[in-house]
């Protein structure tokens, strides 16, 4: 089917209007009209080929909210008119043990990314949510619950599930002591979600200027990581620290903050980490772990949780033709805390 959107054609060029062919729907597919598309920092990395695996032309976008406009003959979960959401995956083998556990993000045979990935059947490169339509296997679409604001829901499909998944994996709830390093797109969601789960939440920041923002998002306090006395007083005071910082940084100041059996989980940095001292880990039975996104079942759980608890990302709405300006602002950390494209603006941008 004919579709259109915005694409990166080269690492050095801005995104431009792009017309392309979506694959024909299969019997178990739903076709979505995209209403809102979140702008993830990984979209910028992929457009600029920072990770050296981008295939051009690239249509980014893996935080997608839309309306079903067509269903395949075997589809049972959705009907035309339903509001659905799609995140970072559009397929997996659905046969391995990980898929059987509802952890398609850890598929033994590799999941299919929403964009810049080979289709499991044809090998064609997938194209993402900066576009008019999406064709997706029904198992990889989540239902938008009643009461969840469609215009603000899109970032839940990446920033939301990326932080929700480790909070659930490490059983965060009332009485849990959670630290969050970084207060950007991921960090602000980690704070909101952990607070909604009943945890005591502390934002760890190099700047005291983040205090007002941290408290407004639901944190109980701010810990200044450059304050040696405050950091010493906070030793052994966290069960879980969620590290959302997207660049290489030193973990040594944070490991002593974990209590016995505590975990620092990395969700923001993709690539080499700084070396860190293993002594605090050995002496305190502490752990450093990583966590990607969650599976489809957990993503649906997140959407239902956010509807029930009224947890939504803080977003700035933009038009499609403002995407290059948004990318520039993201590089300057000039957004609180996530851009969302109103895809109704797409046609006027062509």
What are these regions (language model features)?
Residues 1-3, 296-350:
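C-terminal hydrophobic helical "lid"/dimerization subdomain
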Residues 23-37, 50-100, 105, 127, ...:
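Glycine-rich beta-strand-centered segment in the early N-terminal region that forms part
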Residues 77, 93-181:
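NAD(P)H dinucleotide-binding glycine-rich loop of Rossmann-like/cofactor-binding domains
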Residues 83, 177, 262-263, 287:
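Short glycine-centered segments of the SAM/dcSAM-binding site in methyltransferase folds
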Residues 187-188:
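N-terminal Rossmann-fold NAD(P) dinucleotide-binding loop
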Residues 258-259:
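Helix-to-beta-strand junctions that scaffold the AdoMet/dcAdoMet cofactor pocket
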Residues 263-265, 276-316:
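Rossmann-fold dehydrogenase core element
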